Amino acid sequence: MGSVNSSPNEEFETVPDSQISGFDSPLIPTSVGSYFRDDDDDEKVHPNFISDPENDSLNSDEEFSSLENSDLNLSGAKAESGDDFDPILKRTIISKRKAPSNNEDEEIVKTPRKLVNYVPLKIFNLGDSFDDTITTTVAKLQDLKKEILDSPRSNKSIVITSNTVAKSELQKSIKFSGSIPEIYLDVVTKETISDKYKDWHFISKNCHYEQLMDLEMKDTAYSFLFGSSRSQGKVPEFVHLKCPSITNLLVLFGVNQEKCNSLKINYEKKENSRYDNLCTIFPVNKMLKFLMYFYSDDDNDDVREFFLKAFICLILDRKVFNAMESDHRLCFKVLELFNEAHFINSYFEIVDKNDFFLHYRLLQIFPHLQSALLRRRFSEKQGRTETIQQNIIKEFNEFFDCKNYKNLLYFILTMYGSKFIPFGPKCQVTEYFKDCILDISNETTNDVEISILKGILNLFSKIR
């Protein structure tokens, strides 16, 4: 069998097929050049040539001899010497892997399995852009984390935060409501800036819906709230059998027995600042209708007073106040049954005089009670405008100095629009309030009420 001259300084000769058939060579002679054919895919061929012969690194005999025992040797070839093989043939038969395809899925399937789960890494020279301290810092953090995890805990006690306590109390209060998402508990308990989720809740339990619906189905005569006065002063028999007194009716509404007996907000227990326990309530207009059955002009003062306080506690409840079916026109019909002064006096027996949050809610229901409420609040029977304005400024300074900005916000909302502090740019009290709020807003404060007060006072000063 003939051999091929492998000297790099001589031209290569064309070798006939008969001379290389013993090698089972994949070389195919053509008129254009030699091609390498993959045995696994007859349709894919690759040119057999060196793109840059001058810069090729495999030119020395030492490099060629190092490849003799590698997988690059021709199968079936039994060389007697290093010159029996063409070095070009050794370098071209490098792999049995199929040629890459345009189809990515096909390429992944044809890739050897041992390479699929590996990502090729390359070294980049970032120069001055690479920060050597990053690797040392990461290593220190990993060592510190390992040390913390491996070290024994010195104190097994768990730190209990105020948010943890509030979340636990909220979970207990709403346990009857079924499964509550954890995200709801976090949103409600972590909102501590404005306390918008805390309010007065007269109804704190689920209503007795079936019993109330039974009363509703039996009720054919509407109370005077709905245009008929024939039921006024007389409790229907079917209602009296189920609810002998107003207290029994309130229990059906979902009011606990303690609140039914007191009909007063206990500020020591912070009943005016409780989370909503997501209890179900009966439709507001129907509750008012059933409550009206227990009013009578012939009743003694204690019974009428109990009725009025129950009514005030009910309409101030956040769930009742914000109910979609709540109609304040029904509340006006109840107010007509009492003198305004008597109504305001009963109101202040339930609500603290400094709770301007509920004062503002009451005025949203009964706007025309603003002057009567302010006179009663500042103990001015004669209601002189100059004296009440001085008391209002004094009250403002107290809230402002104590940084009680939430109450200060509702204090402003309660006062404005009355004849004591009217709207418009000519009110000197408004200018004083604006200067005080502007001074505190220039300081570093995170109280959201300050920003709201700035906008409100600017708005009130522009109303003519």
From Swiss-Prot:
Function: Acts in a DNA repair pathway for removal of UV-induced DNA damage that is distinct from classical nucleotide excision repair and in repair of ionizing radiation damage. Functions in homologous recombination repair of DNA double strand breaks and in recovery of stalled replication forks.
Residues carrying Phosphoserine: 81, 101
Segments for region (Disordered): 1-69
Record organism: Saccharomyces cerevisiae (strain ATCC 204508 / S288c) (Baker's yeast)
Subunit note: Component of the Smc5-Smc6 complex which consists of KRE29, MMS21, NSE1, NSE3, NSE4, NSE5, SMC5 and SMC6. Interacts with NSE5.
Main location: nucleus
Acidic residues bias: start-end ranges: 53-65
Residue pairs linked by disulfide bridges in the UniProt entry: none
UniProt GO BP: chromatin looping; DNA repair; double-strand break repair via homologous recombination; regulation of telomere maintenance
Name of the protein in its database record: DNA repair protein KRE29
Domain of life: Eukaryota
UniProt-annotated location(s): Nucleus; Cytoplasm
Any single Gene Ontology cellular-component annotation: cytoplasm
MF-aspect GO terms: ATPase inhibitor activity
Keywords, sorted A to Z: Cytoplasm, DNA damage, DNA recombination, DNA repair, Nucleus, Phosphoprotein
One Pfam family linked to the record: Nse5
